[in-house]
Amino acid sequence: IGSGFGGLAAAIRTQAKGYEVTLLEMRDKPGGRAYVFEDKGFTYDAGPTIVTVPFVLDELAEIAGVKLEDYVKIVPCDPFYRIYFNDGRVFDYRGDQDKLEAEIAKFNPADVEGYRGFQADSRRVFDRAFTDLADHSFDRFTEMVKVAPDLLKLRAEQSVFKRVSSFIQDPSLRMVFSFEPLLIGGNPLNCSSIYSMIHYLEKTWGVHFAMGGTGALVNGLV
């Protein structure tokens, strides 16, 4: 039930096991939060636009016994993002470490070292929150209590912006390294610092785009 990415992934895995699958969707086309709409010849993503963990799509294709590139073309973005500020300055958010640090130095050389600290912290959060807890069941209160100490150690009660600000001083750079929650509909000022792990995801696997937009990716999975 539901044809978002979760429903599509479940359907693909179930079908690969030999079961006949019927996917139910309340809207006029698949996608869920990845819904797209058209207007005057243009197509707009209503939800996610980029791919930060392409390996999960490759895994689904492998399970289905097909090649992902036969259904959708996914290309890397370089830079990941180009960020424009009101004062006319531009920040190219890149995957290459040296180029990224050079961009940081243009805004505040002293923040290069602070960024490295944030980068290490992002990996620490990823290792615990994504690698160890991503498949943890939270359907019972007792299960949540078990991981409470881990969440406290990760300072999950802090916002992403506050966490970034503990490492980086320049106001513009604080925005650069804390805006990712916006991609999932969150507010960096109150979204849990757990989401700072997105930075490590991007640095490790890159930022990618499905040619034709998210709708093309959804149709490829269908």
Regions found by a protein language model. Name each.
Residues P48, L189, H208-G212:
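Alpha-helix capping and helix-loop boundary segments enriched in small/acidic/polar residues
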Residues D39-T43, L182-G185, W205-H208:
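A short glycine/serine-rich beta->alpha loop
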Residues N190-I198:
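Active-site-proximal loop/short-helix segments
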